[in-house]
Amino acid sequence: IAILLLVDTLLSVICLNLFKDKASLTSEKQSVKDDRLIEVLENNFKIGIYNDNSILDTTTVVYDLNKNEVGLSEILTDKPCLIIRFAETNCEECVRFLLIKVMRLYNSDLFNKRILLFASYPNRQALKILVDRLNIKYPVYLVDKLPISCERINFPYCFMLDSTMRTSHVFVPDKYEPQIANTYFELIENRYFK
């Protein structure tokens, strides 16, 4: 009987230690996830501070997919537009993530003219393939470079642009933290598109 009690006690101690190890591991994973989330939020806060209220040049020229020159002021409406900025050199998965997020939120002809895609693609054919594959309905323009510091990060980003060419709500989505992108687009939709 004493041996059975000893074996039972040992098994209980082993099970308790395994449970503690699993709980500790779960806690560590949650801590890493929380740290990552804080880092993404902190980076977007900094990006917003550095890039909000930048003013684009009113003489800026963009090109449609047929290489027709269009003045930026010609494509803006009297209401703020959501600009989706991406480049061929950006992480392809990140670009797709951003475009798919935008396409899910806005699907109205009324709003489609206020959502503009600004792409930097030396290979126009690659851009056309991307647009066709994702069945993008928004106007797409070729833009080499914009005069805001966000251009240097080499990730796709988005912002609101008003008729005075002033940027606001600059945001860089992170494919590993989709809930932040969801919140951003819900807030933008509620404020500007309803």
Predicted stretch roles:
Residues R85, N112-A126, I136-K145:
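Thiol-based oxidoreductase modules, predominantly thioredoxin-like and allied folds used
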Residues M160-K194:
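Thiol-/selenol-based redox modules, centered on thioredoxin-like
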Residues I1-N17:
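Hydrophobic membrane-insertion alpha-helices, especially the h-region
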Residues V61-Y63, K67-L105, R114:
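Short active-site neighborhood of thiol/selenol oxidoreductases, capturing the structured segment around
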